[in-house]
Amino acid sequence: AVHTPRKTVTARTVAQRSYLDLLRRHEVVFSVGPAGTGKTYLAVAVGLSMLRQGRVKRIVLTRPAVEAGERLGFLPGDMAEKINPYLRPLYDALYDMLPQPKVAAMLEAGSIEIAPLAFMRGRTLNEAFMILDEAQNTTREQMKMFLTRMGLGSRMVVAGDMTQVDLPMPSGDARSRSGLVHAMHILKNVPGLAIHHFTKADVVRHPLVGAIVTAYDHANTDSEKS
């Protein structure tokens, strides 16, 4: 279990329990699986716990800001208005564990930072708990850029779903460009790095979500056969 100000976050499946253990023991953890398995949510809980214990000085939450064929340039409004729709799920996880005024105060103080992945370029983040969400939508270059931001005393979680690659592709398979797919292939034997896989059996949203994931998996399998 992980204690946060608003609630105690507990593992609901064996795989989630194993994941929490990896998050506590490893400095870099890749977490892969379908939506609703707690990949990012549990990482945020562990990050908040480590922040409260003084094991890190800040939490940095990020995700690529290109999803489902949309680019920031085509969204209305100023930069804050443009990026907030992409970052909303990260705020939702925080608000579930912390009172909203506390989140606002921590954002103001810099102990929590939420930003698009592009804002990470050129930085070195020391004593930070870094979470990259929707990592399947990074390019190889973006993934390398993120992984090399890690400074002394930092920890890193890379979470994604390899069946939901939304990278725009001129031609060919979007999966082949995904930084997550590539990184997991070339980094699988790096000491100190852990890779954790969730399945649809670990979905902890509404019971129908698991059935929906299964139906789409079957549809994709059928289309590949035909």
Features from the language model and the residues they span:
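Charged, amphipathic alpha-helical linker segments immediately N-terminal to NTP-binding catalytic cores
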Residues: A1-H3
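Conserved helicase motor core of SF1/SF2 NTP-dependent helicases
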Residues: R6-V14, S18, L22-L132, Q136-S226
